[in-house]
Design a protein with these regions (language model features):
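Phosphate- and other anionic-substrate recognition elements at nucleic-acid/protein interfaces
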Residues: 1-166
Length: 166
């Protein structure tokens, strides 16, 4: 059974992480990647994630399963970056666990908004576009995840770090 779990939330611009030992958070943060294009950021990620790996002790990596992307080009860039990140984080005996976003979000009590909750947002902010309401619900769900992190004694402002904690 895994006792040292590294939760990660990766993107083409950063990796957020939370290291849990025996279900208790011990180290967390976010590393930003720099570069004028995805390939420069991949190289930066390779160096920074290698350094991060040297400072962390884990036996399992928990990564959010990619569900959908807006374009094929974005999906390819994410695949390149995730490959670079995972290649640096993995040891020979590292277990990898992929978790669907709705599964971990539900586990921490951050389920999708119900019709009633969505209607409450519309009632509170009348006259907005559907896109505005969708974005507002997304923001509120991000805040729920940040609030969950606070229940563990972690003060974070980055929803990326909060996602890694979740």
């Amino acid at each position: 059974m895994a006792t040292k779990i590294l939760g990660i939330d990766a993107s083409t611009n950063s990796i957020a992480f939370c290291l849990m030992h025996d279900s208790k958070p011990v180290k967390w943060g976010e590393v930003i990647f720099h570069g004028s294009n995805v390939y420069e950021r991949i190289l930066d990620a390779k160096h920074k994630v290698h350094s991060l790996r040297e400072r962390l002790n884990y036996d399992t990596i928990c990564i959010e399963a990619a569900v959908s992307v807006k374009s094929v080009a974005t999906g390819l860039k994410m695949a390149y970056m995730f490959g670079a990140i995972m290649g640096e984080l993995m040891y020979d005996d590292t277990e990898i666990v992929e978790v669907h976003p709705l599964k971990w979000q539900g586990f921490i009590g951050n389920n999708n908004f119900t019709k009633a909750e969505k209607q409450a947002v519309k009632d509170e902010f009348p006259g907005k576009s559907e896109a505005w309401y969708k974005n507002k619900v997304r923001e509120l769900r991000k805040q729920r995840t940040i609030d969950f992190a606070k229940t563990l004694g972690i003060e974070v402002e980055s929803d990326n770090v909060a996602d890694a904690i979740g």
